[in-house]
Amino acid sequence: MVEVVGVDHLVLSVGDFEKSKKFYAPLMEFLGFGVEAEYEGMMGWANGKTLFWIAAADEEGKEHRYRKDDIGFHHYAFRLRNREDVDALQAYLEQNGATIVDPAGEYYDDYYAVFFLDPDGMKLEGMRWGERHEQAAKKRAAKRRAATAKKRTPSARKKWR
């Protein structure tokens, strides 16, 4: 069995690279990312855990505008430390003229988020789960690890033969 240990990077194809770079460069800095690398028509940022890249779409790709409910990318959520960070992100977005589609608020029980658009209209989110969600996620992960470990033990393998 192969186990994914995390998502390494995400690359968004953008319609106007320079316009998107002007949007993403200060946003990524605000979110604690540093520049990983920049090439012609491509730029990436890293925060030690995640790599986030933008790349210029080719001419054919520019003809197909992003629409949230099409097959493929729906939205990307940046998990933040706390509700205050979500509120700070909204203030940053407002100060920088970003389009906020759903303002900071509790969208589900114990789930606080702000939703906004990039220059191509791609939906992004800054969010924070509350303590109840974190504890439930930790319990689910522990159960999965225990079940996986049990399948790998010699006595468990004998039962499956």
Write out the residue ranges for each language-model feature:
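Short beta-strand/turn micro-motifs at beta-sheet edges
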Residues: 60-66
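Short, hinge-like loop/turn segments at secondary-structure boundaries
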Residues: 54-55, 120
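Core segments of cupin and vicinal oxygen chelate
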Residues: 11-53
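Acetyl-CoA-dependent GNAT
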Residues: 56-60, 129
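A generic "binding-loop/recognition-motif" signal
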Residues: 41, 82, 120
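Vicinal oxygen chelate
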Residues: 2-3, 7-15, 66-161
